[in-house]
């Protein structure tokens, strides 16, 4: 069984390996002027940065890391999120699995791997390298479980998030400017804008739900302006009797149904994949799209379109 650590604990692993693998040298006439060379270390790293821009960033970071740590070679394996979820747990149970990998947060992935004793706790490294000064408690909690994997949000630290991301609304600046539209200040203004965009014969929200996972972003963007942060945390961690069956969640679902009925999403969106819908948006098909800040790199290159970003606004009374 092979335990592994998350993406941003690479430095710690390599520090230990380099010190362990450097042979002792007894000075002699021949060796006093020679620098001992550590045995080459291969570090197998799995990540899900498969899109062009972010993949290029990872390649650059890996190259810089290797240059800073002579004798260390990173064998990078790139997978989609779906592939990673399907293959990672089995791979970690074998000696040939990755040394470092990204793990989807939450009970079904990280929690299950903690229960299976596949992940290495990082508490000591967090203390030694003062990660608490760099990462907020809320970010650390999302990567923490009790050793039995049953309690989410407390206990041992099992990973460090490579990014802190938000879900919001990207908009096509050219389309907005050509029609005199501005960023809405309230949710009512946002829905008025959707109607105006539709009336112009433009798809208001570029969206494809074929992959399944990304549909929660459309819902949660609305949900988050209706509920409190305490509710979100209680629900995520499964504490204080938090339930999904609330008036606010029902209201958010009703908004989704209303947008579908009014054709505010891309035509036949249930048959369009996430990446394909983003490509359409990038080429000017659709005035807006609701997704995460991770897409920014893909939108700023290889296109003549200009894009902006804003968080979905709430009404003053959060209704």
Where are these regions (language model features)?
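Short, solvent-exposed loop/beta-turn-alpha elements that line the ligand-binding surface or hinge
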Residues: 123-138, 226-251, 301-302, 314-319
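Hinge/lid segment of periplasmic solute-binding proteins
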Residues: 107-167, 191, 218-220, 308
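Glycine-centered hinge/linker elements that transmit conformational signals in sensory
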Residues: 192-197, 237-269
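Short helices/loops that flank or line small-molecule/ion binding pockets
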Residues: 85-96, 116, 175-176, 195-199, ...
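Short helix-initiation/N-cap motifs at beta->coil->alpha
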Residues: 78-87, 187-192, 268-282
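Conserved N-terminal structural module of periplasmic/extracytoplasmic solute-binding proteins
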Residues: 6, 21-118, 128, 133-134, ...
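Extracytoplasmic/periplasmic substrate-binding proteins
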Residues: 48, 61-62, 108-112, 217-218, ...
């Amino acid at each position: 069984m092979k335990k592994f650590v998350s993406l941003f604990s690479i430095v710690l692993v390599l520090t230990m390996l380099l010190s362990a693998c450097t042979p002792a040298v007894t000075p002699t006439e021949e060796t006093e002027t020679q620098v001992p060379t550590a045995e080459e270390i291969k570090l197998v790293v799995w990540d899900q940065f498969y899109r062009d821009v972010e993949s290029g960033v990872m390649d650059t970071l890996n190259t810089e890391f290797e240059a800073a740590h002579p004798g260390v070679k990173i064998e990078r394996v790139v997978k989609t999120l779906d592939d990673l979820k399907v293959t990672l747990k089995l791979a970690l149970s074998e000696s040939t699995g990755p040394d470092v990998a990204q793990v989807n947060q939450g009970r079904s992935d990280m929690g299950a791997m903690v229960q299976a004793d596949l992940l290495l706790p990082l508490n000591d490294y967090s203390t030694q390298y003062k990660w608490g000064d760099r990462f907020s408690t809320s970010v650390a909690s999302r990567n923490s479980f009790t050793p039995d994997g049953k309690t989410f949000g407390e206990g041992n630290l099992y990973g460090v998030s490579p990014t802190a991301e938000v879900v919001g609304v990207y908009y096509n600046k050219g389309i907005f400017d050509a029609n005199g539209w501005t960023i809405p200040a309230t949710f009512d203004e946002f829905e008025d804008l959707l109607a105006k965009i539709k009336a112009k014969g433009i798809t208001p929200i570029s969206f494809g739900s074929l992959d399944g996972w990304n549909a929660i972003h459309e819902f949660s963007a609305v949900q988050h302006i209706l509920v409190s942060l305490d509710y979100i945390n209680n629900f995520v961690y499964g504490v204080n009797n938090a339930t999904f069956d609330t008036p606010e969640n029902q209201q958010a679902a009703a908004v989704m149904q209303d947008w579908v009925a009014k054709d505010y999403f891309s035509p036949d969106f249930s048959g369009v994949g996430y990446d394909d819908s983003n490509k359409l948006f990038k080429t000017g098909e659709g005035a807006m799209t609701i997704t995460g800040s991770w897409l920014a790199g893909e939108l700023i290159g290889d296109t003549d379109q200009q894009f902006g970003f804003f968080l979905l606004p709430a009404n003053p009374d959060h209704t």
